[in-house]
């Protein structure tokens, strides 16, 4: 009995009097038990279910009543497979979700790999672009020479400067000192030429000045050529593979010849 003389859901569906010790009373309430027991009675039969519950221990009866009720409702939806069809559908759903999870993991790993490769490729492109820019500006050979000689001077320093010990600033100072020495030598040559013309008693001042200037220019050109030849031998002994030294010498010779 469910209390106050009300029958249980099974007895209500069977339209019988619910007696004390009814095997269905603890598991089928008066309000909703009738609908649940209707499926059980249609699939298994009330007498078969009562015998099954009576043979089970009291501790196992609640779980058995729930299982029987679920199986009866599944059999009404699928008379052939019952709850097996629902279990199979759940297994298929689990397999589909596992395949999707594996695909997402593989895609994530591939994306990380492509990101690392892209970063490495980008760094290589930037390095190649920087090297190409250095070669275009004339810094490539200088950087290679500094690396082979242990020099740490940056590429932004004078690309055409040379020195015997690998320093860019020292080479620039050597060229500056050489040009200054040539200028001083030309001035001294002009001074001695004019003294010589005055001592010789030249009558025509214009011709004397021209002759003195020509002699001084020729003397200074010879002196500058000797100086450049000496420095060229030093530069060629210290760094034998540079075309910029010859370019600088040709520029200096052109300047002296025009003067």
From Swiss-Prot:
InterPro entries: LOB
Cell location: Nucleus
Annotated LOB domain residues: 6-108
Cited PROSITE patterns: LOB (PS50891)
Disulphide bonds in the chain: none
A GO cellular-component term linked to this record: nucleus
Keywords: Developmental protein, Nucleus
Induction: Induced by auxin. Induced by ethylene.
GO molecular function, one term: protein homodimerization activity
Pfam (any one): LOB
Function: Acts as a positive regulator of adventitious (crown) root formation by promoting its initiation. Acts as a positive regulator of lateral root formation. Regulated by the auxin response factor and transcriptional activator ARF23/ARF1. Involved in auxin-mediated cell dedifferentiation, and may promote the initial cell division in the pericycle cells adjacent to the peripheral vascular cylinder at the base of the stem. May act upstream of the gene regulatory network controlling adventitious root (crown) development.
UniProt similarity note: Belongs to the LOB domain-containing protein family.
PANTHER family given in the database record: LOB DOMAIN CONTAINING PROTEIN, LOB DOMAIN-CONTAINING PROTEIN CRL1
Subunit structure: Can form homodimers.
Name recorded for this polypeptide: LOB domain-containing protein CRL1
Organism: Oryza sativa subsp. japonica (Rice)
């Amino acid at each position: 009995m469910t209390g106050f003389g009300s029958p249980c859901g099974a007895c209500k569906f069977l339209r019988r009097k619910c007696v004390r010790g009814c095997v269905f009373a603890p598991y089928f309430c008066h309000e909703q038990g009738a609908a649940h027991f209707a499926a059980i009675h249609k699939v298994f039969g009330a007498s078969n279910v009562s015998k099954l519950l009576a043979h089970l221990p009291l501790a196992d009866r609640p779980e058995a009543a729930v299982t029987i009720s679920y199986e009866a409702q599944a059999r009404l939806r699928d008379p052939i497979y019952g709850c097996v069809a629902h279990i199979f559908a759940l297994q298929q759903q689990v397999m589909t979700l596992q395949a999707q999870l594996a695909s997402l993991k593989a895609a994530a790993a591939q994306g990380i790999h492509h990101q690392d490769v892209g970063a490495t490729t980008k760094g290589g492109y930037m390095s190649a672009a920087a090297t190409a820019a250095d070669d275009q500006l004339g810094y490539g050979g200088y950087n290679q020479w500094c690396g082979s000689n242990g020099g740490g001077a940056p590429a932004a320093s004078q690309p055409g400067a040379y020195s015997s010990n690998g320093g860019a600033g020292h080479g620039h100072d050597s060229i500056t000192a050489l040009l200054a020495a040539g200028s001083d030598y030309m001035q001294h040559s002009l001074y001695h030429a004019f003294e010589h013309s005055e001592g010789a008693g030249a009558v025509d001042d214009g011709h004397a000045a021209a002759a003195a200037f020509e002699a001084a220019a020729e003397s200074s050109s010879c002196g500058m050529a000797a100086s450049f030849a000496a420095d060229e031998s030093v530069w060629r002994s210290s760094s034998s593979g540079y075309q910029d030294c010859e370019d600088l010498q040709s520029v200096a010779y052109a300047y002296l010849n025009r003067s």
